[in-house]
């Protein structure tokens, strides 16, 4: 089967899941959760990332987003992964709040020299992203993706309503202020 060629124009959205190496449950401590929230806000404010929806689970991050500038999506995603890797590894090294799982996690994140061609000593995110192109001319599909990612904490039995989960944009869609700057996706603004 031929791989889908992604259209990186700025009109289109992408539904992306970034998974932590070995599915390590990193995002159970506030310091690591805050690193992702801060990075999402930084990239939304300064790097041209337009976020329609997000949801941070214990070992992965879901995003429905696009780039402000044409053809910049792959670079924004790459830079986001690099930046968050650096920030989270720095927090793991933080002596003020030591994590008892530090040694074990660092072993998981260590790059095997014979497998990767990259020079990074550690990898935090899996190299392969689950990334789906969501054409701007199919707003119903985009809205369905947003609803699906907001349901993740409910399916994981963390909350009974999506908007009760603070590490998600579901609360923004219910009129509450969330932790990350999101642009609400309004299906009425798009024509088929």
Per-range role (PLM):
Residues 1-192:
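Short catalytic/metal-binding and nucleic-acid-binding patches
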């Amino acid at each position: 089967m031929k791989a889908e060629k992604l259209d990186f124009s700025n009109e289109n959205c992408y539904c992306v899941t970034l998974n932590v190496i070995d599915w390590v449950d990193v995002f159970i401590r506030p310091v690591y959760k805050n690193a992702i929230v801060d990075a999402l806000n930084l990239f939304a404010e300064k790097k041209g990332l337009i976020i329609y929806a997000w949801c941070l689970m214990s070992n992965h991050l879901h995003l429905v987003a696009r780039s402000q500038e044409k053809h910049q999506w792959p670079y924004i995603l790459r830079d986001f992964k690099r930046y968050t890797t650096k920030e989270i590894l720095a927090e793991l090294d933080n002596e003020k709040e030591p994590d008892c799982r530090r040694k074990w996690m660092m072993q998981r994140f260590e790059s095997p020299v014979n497998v990767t061609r990259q020079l990074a000593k550690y990898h935090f995110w899996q190299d392969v992203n689950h990334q789906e192109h969501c054409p701007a001319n199919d707003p119903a599909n985009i809205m369905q993706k947003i609803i699906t990612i907001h349901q993740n904490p409910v399916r994981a039995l963390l909350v009974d309503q999506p908007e009760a989960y603070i590490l998600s944009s579901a609360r923004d869609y219910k009129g509450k202020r969330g932790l990350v700057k999101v642009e609400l996706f309004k299906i009425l603004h798009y024509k088929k």
